Amino acid sequence: MAFDKKLLEIVACPVCKGKLEFDKQAQTLNCKFDKLAFPITEGIPVLLENRAQPLS
């Protein structure tokens, strides 16, 4: 599923307020600074720290 690039320009990491990157294969929004992956569920980003997974 494609992710809206315009939305990607305005969303931010809820932890550090930094830029997020879309991982098409994993269907996540990733914060490289905090090393967290936020899931995208049914096309909706879930930007909750307690739902994020650590990036390896």
Curated annotation (Swiss-Prot):
<protein>
    <recommendedName>
        <fullName>UPF0434 protein Sden_2197</fullName>
    </recommendedName>
</protein>
<dbReference type="GO" id="GO:0005829">
    <property type="term" value="C:cytosol"/>
</dbReference>
<comment type="similarity">
    <text>Belongs to the UPF0434 family.</text>
</comment>
<dbReference type="Pfam" id="PF03966">
    <property type="entry name" value="Trm112p"/>
</dbReference>
<dbReference type="InterPro" id="IPR005651">
    <property type="entry name" value="Trm112-like"/>
</dbReference>
